[in-house]
Amino acid sequence: MRGIRWTTTAFLLLTAAPGLAQSANQSAASAADDAFGTSVGNERVGLYNPDSARGFSPVTAGNLRLDGLYIDRPPDFSQRLISGSNIRVGLTAQGFPFAAPTGIADFALRRAGSDPALNATLEVGPYTARRFALDGQTPLTSSISLGAGLDYGREDQPNGTKDYYYTFTIAPVWRPRDGIEVMPFYSRYYWKGWSGQPLYFVAGDFLPPRIRRHENPRQSWAGEVGVAPTFGIHSRASLGPWLLQAGLFKSGFEIEGSAVELFQNVDRDGMGDRQIIELGHRRTWSVSGEMRVSRQFDEGKRRHTLMLNLRGRDRQRRYGGGVTLAFGRVPVDQKGPIPEPDFDLGPPSHDHIRQANVGAGYDLKWLGVGQLSLGIQKVSYRKQAERPGVQLPTSRSNPWLVNAAINVEASKSLVFYGSYSTGLEESPVAPAVASNSGFAPPAILTKQYDAGLRYVISPNVRLVAGVYQIEKPYYGLNASQLFTNLGTIRNRGIELSLTGTIAPGLNIVVGTVLMDATLSGEAVEQGLVGKRPVGSSRRTSFANIEYQLPGAAGVTAVVGYGGRGRTIANRMNSSTIDPANSFSLGARYRFDLGGKPTSIFARVANLTDEYSYQMSGEGLYYSPGRRFIMTLTSDL
């Protein structure tokens, strides 16, 4: 591994030259067309992200795209491979063939251009964290360019845990002629010492007492070691009226040493039963991909597109065998070192999923009138599960999935839209505290309705307003800590987004979601769970305001806000977390250093040091406190 790392670094240093695509002059706020979730590099703005959209997770649901093509992604993408992402919901999802409920997380690959270039990033914070990254590209021939990146850093988690990581990516691009591109890539992400925050489970209808933040690090022996490679090939060919797109990917991770620390039966005085769960060796590998053939037919102002699509995945997973050890009743705010115990791990469990989707679609774009999209898919889903000493029956599902979307241009500035879609999605995996920890339920059938409008207030300002309803089977913890089906969840919401330049030098990304999440079914009727899911909130809001200061060339003030309403804190809905509001304040300075574009972005997150709790299953953990981050980015 050491040889690859230094070879990549040498390549980057030798190709220093102007003009890298991910430059010092870009920001997520300036790139955002709406407030539903946009990232550029390590900056992110918007209401949603790949792990949370409309009350669900696109990652968990399997609704990920790599430049428009399906990928089944168990690990995180390296930022050296990905230049950014967008969350596609409502009107923006209509441009994606075979759109799925929950929303789509579409990741953009870093593509090497035809000019030599090098970009460097140095980041300090939060706390004692440090990060250094390089991204470079150079032409090898008239039709082949090579891109590569390296990232090394030390993270400092909100609980005080320190961990280290590095990533690297190699990604050549072949463009034999206009309209044809083939991009193989290899990316590897390695980390050591990471551990999640401690979880607190209270003994009644109250929250834990205030716990000192950043002073609860993991045990010295408890940090996990993991590696997550992602590699494959992405290609497209535009041949007159024909468009061919294909991608084949392999991704996965292997993790050792995961230890989850939690405190059960926490009382009002801050005493709790201390436990550590060693999860054992975990491994997930998936081969996935998509192939699509499209044919366009132009008819005056109308463009018809017919599509045939094949999508599939083969995922194998090893998990389970973990063990829980108890360390007595202790003050939850006075963690002391524990000698490393001898964990007697049990035998693991295995899952194997095979899925194939065959689909056909039709898209009509009518200039000045609107757009119509229709799609149908036949799915073949098989899941084999093996528990210690038990071979479970194979789970099978062969549904037909449909999607239909329409938008109508009422005027040049006003568009109305509506859609309906069904999907076969993965449900969340059982958390570490479940009696069946790591268990992944069979895929679930989901459906979604949405409608709304987009109004272009001015050439630079856009308003989007919409409503949606999503229904899915709901899995959660029952009274005996078994992760099981507890009924049906229905999320209904109103989304609002306002983005653009509202005055000279003043750019905004503002959005809010008002959501009504409800549960129904036998468990609710019998009083085993409440009518609202754990962790749900009726309001989520976001704002990012950037103002270029007059008289201060290159200086932009940045103000951020993130907030949520009251949050359901337990299964019976008898406890809640108060509304939380977090503000950030920063400044970005753009200038030339030796004739090269450079920027410094300094900001303070959680400016008022707001203290709140968040949910992980039915466990609670505290939000990060006030912290400072400074990022220096320069084209070299």
Protein language model annotation of sequence segments:
Residues 34, 55, 61, 65-67, ...:
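A beta-strand signature from Gram-negative outer-membrane beta-barrel systems
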Residues 21, 534-636:
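Conserved C-terminal beta-signal and adjacent last beta-strands/turns
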Residues 367-371, 469-471, 485-570:
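Gram-negative outer-membrane beta-barrel transporters
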Residues 192-194, 198-203, 314-323, 382, ...:
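Surface-exposed extracellular loop regions of Gram-negative outer-membrane beta-barrel proteins
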Residues 226-254, 273-387, 409:
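Face-selective signature of the C-terminal outer-membrane beta-barrel domain
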Residues 173-175, 179-236, 252, 256-284, ...:
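Acidic/polar loop-and-plug regions of large Gram-negative outer-membrane beta-barrel proteins
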Residues 117, 123-154, 159-197, 221-242, ...:
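Transmembrane beta-barrel wall of Gram-negative outer-membrane proteins
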Residues 143-146, 178-182, 241-244, 299-303, ...:
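Repeated loop/turn-to-beta-strand initiation elements of outer-membrane beta-barrel proteins
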